[in-house]
Design a protein with these regions (language model features):
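Class I (Rossmann-like) S-adenosyl-L-methionine-dependent methyltransferase catalytic domain
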Residues: 3, 26, 91-116, 122, ...
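Conserved short histidine dyad/triad with adjacent acidic residue
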Residues: 14-33
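Short, conserved beta-strand element in jelly-roll/cupin
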Residues: 34-47
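Short acidic-glycine-tyrosine-enriched beta hairpin
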Residues: 53-70
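Ligand-binding loop in jelly-roll beta-barrel domains
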Residues: 69-91
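A short acidic, Gly/Pro-enriched loop at the edge of an enzyme's catalytic core
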Residues: 177-185
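A short SAM/SAH-binding and catalytic strip from SAM-dependent methyltransferases
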Residues: 184-198
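A short glycine-rich, Lys/Arg-flanked "PGG" loop and its adjoining helix->strand segment in the class I
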Residues: 200-212
């Protein structure tokens, strides 16, 4: 039940009368990985058979019946007046992808959820809002900034639709001029697009505007001897460089590992180079 309580409804199907129930549900169906189905009988009686061939008879009094991802099931109306409804649920990390077709929340942001407590967060270079909206859905008080006014407008519109406690602002990411303090600052795939001479100031500004005990999460491209970065990013971290900027902070996670872009080389293979991922905690006051 705890897992189900952490799920979010991203699609509600129309109610189906007995003779309208799709053939796919009668013959046998399974929803994709990461998709839970909530089955409700609105009236009448329904026979539900799941993967283990165990059958149960459901009525309106039974309330919600959750069907796990990739679990085969069939339904059979037992009365002519049967009416049912299906709603689809997913975890927070997949919600905006499934509901709005956005890019998935960055995996590093999802992983940090197990370490970083809910608080006041800043998403630097929010783009379409894949990380900021996820954090808002998880209960963070979120400020999202980007230098693209259209992106800022889109994030604000989605936040309003979803009733999230967040706001998006237009901001020059090279400015190193944050105006508030935060418990958590996220910058995924952002530093590689900054002007190199502003990077030290931007990092120092992030650090200065992180509350004691707060966290910074950075993911960015690298250029190393073993894997030179062929992409024309304005800035790329060198081996160990990002860690040095955070000397004196507690390193919760640090890794330099191969990643791939959507871009491909002349042979049609994904272009690979290293990315640095670092989650670090500011010392307590």
């Amino acid at each position: 039940m705890d897992e189900q309580m952490a799920l979010f409804c991203y699609q509600e199907m129309p109610a189906w009368q007995a003779d309208e129930i799709p053939d796919a549900l009668r013959a046998g169906h399974a929803f994709d990985e990461g998709e839970w189905a909530c089955l409700n009988v609105l009236q009448g009686r329904l026979k539900l058979t799941e993967a283990d061939n165990a059958s149960v008879e459901l009525t309106a009094e039974d309330g919600d019946h959750m069907i796990a991802p990739q679990q085969q099931f069939t339904v059979e109306p037992l009365t002519d007046d049967t009416e049912i409804k299906l709603s689809l649920y997913c975890a927070a990390k997949d919600y905006f992808n499934k509901k709005y077709g956005m890019s998935a929340t960055h995996s590093a942001v999802v992983a940090a959820e197990n370490i970083v407590p809910v608080g006041k967060a800043l998403d630097m270079g929010c783009g379409q809002g894949r990380n900021a909206l996820f954090l808002g859905l998880k209960g963070f008080d979120v400020t999202a900034v980007d230098n693209n006014p259209q992106a800022v407008q889109n994030v604000n519109e989605l936040a309003h639709i979803e009733g999230l406690d967040m706001r998006a602002l237009e901001y020059d990411l090279n400015a190193a001029n944050l105006q508030d303090h935060f418990d958590y600052i996220v910058a995924t795939v952002v530093f590689m697009f900054l002007h190199p001479r502003f990077v030290p100031q931007v990092i120092a500004d992030m650090q200065a505007h992180t509350n004691p005990g707060g966290y910074n999460l950075i993911v960015s491209a690298m250029d190393t001897e073993d894997f030179p970065c062929p992409m024309p990013f304005p800035f790329k971290f060198k081996e160990g460089e990002l860690r040095e900027y955070y000397r004196g902070w507690e390193i919760a996670e640090y890794k330099e590992e191969l990643g791939a872009m959507h871009a491909k080389d002349a042979a049609g293979n994904p272009i690979q180079f290293k990315f640095v991922t670092m989650l670090t905690k500011k010392p307590e006051a």
